[in-house]
């Protein structure tokens, strides 16, 4: 009897418990990280970043046809089920204009990261095309290595370096380009000290000492920015006005519900025509993303049906 994970999107492939026997066949290195729970059930040693990376390799290969995936030490190793949820809810948002999920949607991933996780899932699940932006040259190199080592991805995913300090869409969205949606997992903390404290809490909760689990740290640009998440998303909202006719839906994850009111005020200030909040849940973890558009219903219908 497989237990259901509460709250995952109906199309998410990860509702059931992990089939560890199958995943170990897909990626044999996962076997060394298996442990037994107090109840005597087999599990993965989630406190070990190498175990989490091995699990991700197996999940991406088994469910998303990504045979070759790796990230450098010190970069965030994302939980696949939660990342897939964002993609599926985004698909529902894109379907509202025409009643069907567009098969040839063009998506911009702000901060694609070393793991390239959102494009990998979106290409496999919906056949979408992605542009991924990134400030870190090391993260960009890692993402490009993943794309280049998996057949077919070069045609579906392209990467761009954000060279302008503090810019989000400026310099990334070119003059004649159009995107059905943007997505983003913004940096959460407002300082390096806060980011370190957050990583330390995570280590303590997992029973690790200070030197363990470097992968739970993440790189500076992944974890914090001046002013934290609210300031980052406000900047995104401000810039989005300049691309109101080139992008149908702008979206971003918001880690805490209390961060929403100042963002709603910012969206009112820039004249967003429609604002949507999508609630998500993975186990005990609650998350959400907000979406906004400068197009009315008819304009969105025309945008979806445009020549591509």
UniProtKB/Swiss-Prot annotation:
One of its GO terms (molecular function) is 23S rRNA (adenine(1618)-N(6))-methyltransferase activity. Gene3D superfamilies: Vaccinia Virus protein VP39 (3.40.50.150). It is an enzyme of class 2 (transferase). It catalyses: adenosine(1618) in 23S rRNA + S-adenosyl-L-methionine = N(6)-methyladenosine(1618) in 23S rRNA + S-adenosyl-L-homocysteine + H(+). One of its GO terms (cellular component) is cytoplasm. InterPro entries: METTL16/RlmF, rRNA_lsu_MeTfrase_F, SAM-dependent_MTases_sf. It is found in: Cytoplasm. Its EC number is 2.1.1.181. Recombinant protein is able to methylate partially deproteinized 50S ribosomal subunit, but neither the completely assembled 50S subunits nor completely deproteinized 23S rRNA. PANTHER family: RNA N6-ADENOSINE-METHYLTRANSFERASE METTL16, SAM-DEPENDENT METHYLTRANSFERASE. Keywords: Cytoplasm, Methyltransferase, rRNA processing, S-adenosyl-L-methionine, Transferase. Coiled coil: none annotated. HAMAP family: 23SrRNA_methyltr_F. It comes from Escherichia coli (strain K12). Its main location: cytoplasm. Specifically methylates the adenine in position 1618 of 23S rRNA. This is Ribosomal RNA large subunit methyltransferase F. GO terms for biological process: rRNA base methylation.
């Amino acid at each position: 009897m497989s237990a259901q994970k509460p709250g995952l999107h109906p199309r998410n492939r990860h509702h059931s418990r992990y089939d560890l026997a199958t995943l170990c066949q897909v990626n044999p290195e996962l076997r060394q990280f298996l442990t037994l729970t107090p109840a005597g059930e087999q599990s993965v040693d989630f406190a070990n970043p190498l175990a989490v990376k091995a699990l991700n390799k197996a999940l991406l290969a088994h469910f998303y046809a990504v045979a070759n995936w790796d990230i450098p030490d010190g970069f965030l190793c994302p939980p696949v089920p939660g990342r897939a949820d964002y993609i599926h809810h985004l698909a529902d948002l894109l379907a509202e204009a025409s009643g069907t999920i567009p098969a040839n949607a063009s998506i911009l991933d702000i901060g694609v990261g070393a793991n390239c996780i959102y494009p990998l899932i979106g290409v496999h699940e919906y056949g979408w095309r992605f542009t991924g932006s990134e400030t870190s040259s090391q993260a960009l190199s890692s993402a490009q290595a993943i794309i280049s080592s998996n057949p077919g991805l070069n045609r579906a995913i392209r990467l761009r370096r954000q060279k302008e300090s503090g810019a989000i869409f400026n310099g990334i969205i070119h003059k004649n380009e159009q995107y059905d949606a943007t997505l983003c997992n913004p940096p959460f903390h407002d300082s390096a000290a806060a980011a370190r404290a957050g990583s330390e809490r995570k280590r303590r909760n997992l029973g690790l000492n200070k030197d363990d689990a470097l992968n739970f740290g993440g790189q500076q640009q992944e974890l914090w920015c001046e002013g934290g998440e609210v300031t980052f998303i406000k900047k995104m909202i401000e810039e989005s006005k300049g691309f109101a006719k080139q992008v149908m839906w702008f979206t971003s994850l918001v880690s805490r519900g209390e961060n929403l009111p100042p963002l709603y005020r910012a969206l009112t200030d820039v004249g967003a025509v429609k604002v949507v909040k999508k609630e998500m849940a993975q186990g005990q973890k609650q998350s959400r993303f907000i979406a906004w558009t400068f197009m009315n219903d008819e304009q969105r219908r025309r945008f979806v049906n445009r020549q591509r």
